[in-house]
Amino acid sequence: MVAIMNHNFFEQSKIFFENGDIKNTLETYEKAISYIDQKEKSSYLQFLNQILSYCRENNLKEEEAVVLRSLGRTHSIFKQYVESLKYHEESLKIQRQLGNKMDVAEGLLYLAEDLEVSGNYENCIKAFQDAEELFRELGKLRKTKEIQKELSRLMDFSKQMVEDEYYLKEFNIDKY
């Protein structure tokens, strides 16, 4: 069932792209991301790169930023976090230039998730804090509370890691 839903969304997205409807292409692909088939990795990445080229050739900056974010999310699903981070950073750069705070805030959340997975907790926390600030400015209080829970969890985890590291060094446990 999941594979069928993904296939339908992915195929719909391709049809929209062939018809030149970039907005619906990207919206439909966003739905397909939730059902990505791990065996079709190259198809997804190739498709997104085609859209990215089209957006760049036609100077569609807003759409380019969305495609870059989708590339980041797709690489993340395939556990290619270095590539994912690269695309998220590039997307955020464009979103900031465009001044769309909502897109920047959402992009920061995706960036934070990948930073956490890659073990870069300091930058992860910073990205979550920046996203929280933007969501607060936008009046998205529910989202702000969700981020605060994530931040609390990360702070507790970081504190535990520091304590564990201290005990390992203090009692020479790491030498055995």
Language model features with spans:
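Intrinsically disordered, low-complexity regions
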Residues: 1-176
